[in-house]
Amino acid sequence: MDFDLEPSLEELIKQDTLKWIFVGGKGGVGKTTTSSSIAVQLALQHPNDEFLLISTDPAHNLSDAFCQKFGKDARKVEGLSNLSCMEIDPEAAMSDLQQQAQQYNNDPNDPLKSIMNDMTGSIPGIDEALSFMEVLKHIKNQKVNESDDSTDKISYRTIIFDTAPTGHTLRFLQLPSTLQKLLGKFQQLSGKLGPMMSMLGGGGQGQQDMFAKLNEVQKNVEEVNEQFTNPDLTTFVCVCISEFLSLYETERMIQELMSYQMDVNSIVVNQLLFADDDENPCKRCVARWKMQKKYLDQMAELYEDYHLVKMPLLGSEIRGVENLKRFSKFLIKPYDPKVDRAIITEMKEQ
């Protein structure tokens, strides 16, 4: 059956089951603006619910986008009382991890402690792993079932991720299954290492506490893995620009996301010129728009069963809550250059 999906994210914004929304793509295509716009629209459309926007990109831009300083702890956005933001710092998380390891065992000669310290410094993708551990902290605050009526939780309806460029993001999303296997091996080792350490004079309460902590982490990882592969709970929004390399990267990302069994059915195309509807377009703009239209046509054919959202190029950066409110409307109601160009020109750089 041939049909075109609505070229907007209205369906995503209105979906009442989503707990996790990932926003990602190649570097420099407007991921932070898109993730911030999605978060703003969610907060506006559902004023009685709480939302959290997390940056897992080492080059944090949320503070710049909202003109407000954010850190490793969730902080309310000024002007949107039901939206909070946080920026995960992998280096700070690494320091915290090492301090926690010290608490479990103060014996510097314990061989197991030495192994753990070596591993935390040498695991490939450790930055993504530490970011993921921060996510695990927040899943405990997530109500997956409405029957969960606990009062000691901050219940976020949805958590939105402003992710790092494609390679980092794919490693991050692969972590639940990777950690699941790794922690399973640790559990197998714990049964063998415990008696062996006792014979060597090591072991004790510190190791028991460490393995108990690993048990808890494994359960959380399994829960996250189940949620990330459930299309009712999790979706991924691809962000790109209308150029060959960006289109190639988007296709590669979609194929990998599908291999992880993660839902993806929305693509946001940023920085479009719409020169056909400009009264006095420059020759360079017309030439570039011609190139953009060529790749837009390819995307329309390749992703006919996706929500393909077309967003305009602005003359200045989109900063501040008010500008994000204006710009994010085009995620819901498709941008019409004949009608909406005035709204774009009204946006002032902060």
Swiss-Prot record:
Keyword Cytoplasm attached: yes
Domain of life: Eukaryota
HAMAP family: Asna1_Get3 (MF_03112)
EC class name: hydrolase
Subunit-level organization: Homodimer. Component of the Golgi to ER traffic (GET) complex, which is composed of GET1, GET2 and GET3. Within the complex, GET1 and GET2 form a heterotetramer which is stabilized by phosphatidylinositol binding and which binds to the GET3 homodimer. Interacts with the chloride channel protein GEF1.
Gene Ontology BP annotations: tail-anchored membrane protein insertion into ER membrane
Zinc is among the record's keywords: yes
Catalytic residue list: 57
PANTHER family recorded: ARSENICAL PUMP-DRIVING ATPASE ARSENITE-TRANSLOCATING ATPASE, ATPASE GET3
Name by which UniProt lists this protein: ATPase GET3
Purpose: ATPase required for the post-translational delivery of tail-anchored (TA) proteins to the endoplasmic reticulum. Recognizes and selectively binds the transmembrane domain of TA proteins in the cytosol. This complex then targets to the endoplasmic reticulum by membrane-bound receptors GET1 and GET2, where the tail-anchored protein is released for insertion. This process is regulated by ATP binding and hydrolysis. ATP binding drives the homodimer towards the closed dimer state, facilitating recognition of newly synthesized TA membrane proteins. ATP hydrolysis is required for insertion.
UniProt-listed InterPro entries: Anion-transp_ATPase-like_dom, ATPase_ArsA/GET3, ATPase_ArsA/GET3_euk, P-loop_NTPase
Binding residues annotated for ATP, in chain numbering: 26-33, 243, 270
Predominant cellular place of this UniProt entry's protein: cytoplasm
EC number: 3.6.-.-
One MF term in the entry's GO annotations: metal ion binding
Keywords: ATP-binding, Cytoplasm, Endoplasmic reticulum, Golgi apparatus, Hydrolase, Metal-binding, Nucleotide-binding, Transport, Zinc
Entries under Pfam families matching the protein: ArsA_ATPase
Binding-site positions, Zn(2+): 282, 285
Similarity remark: Belongs to the arsA ATPase family.
Cell compartments where the protein resides: Cytoplasm; Endoplasmic reticulum; Golgi apparatus
Entry GO CC: GET complex; Golgi apparatus
